[in-house]
Amino acid sequence: VLLVEDNQLNAEIAAELLRMSGLTVDCAWDGIEAVDCLATCPDGYYDMVFMDIQMPRMNGYDATRAIRSSARDYCKRVPIVAMTANAFAEDVKKSLDAGMNAHLSKPVDLNALEQTLQRFRYEPSAEQPQ
């Protein structure tokens, strides 16, 4: 998975939670780096993207819109999950309107994380190419 988080401590905690779920984690430190990662990786390289919202240079909403507007079909399909302290209903709506597939509030609850992983783990859009 790709974890997009500008705060090093938050990134370390989130990466450890994801690794505890058996995942390999790459980190991008802002939205621009996330867009670049998805623009240059092979199709299917990342099964999911966990995206912080409030980041310097490019926020999570704008990064998601840029990823979704890519000419690459893979970028239109890869599940993107907001992982943010913004937890109000309007924040969830804004994430979904930007093109994200789900929203997790920080601090991340391990059960909610596992449910989100299961929700997207076996969808065709998240499969590695053969």
Language-model features: locations:
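C-terminal compact regulatory domains
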Residues: 1-130
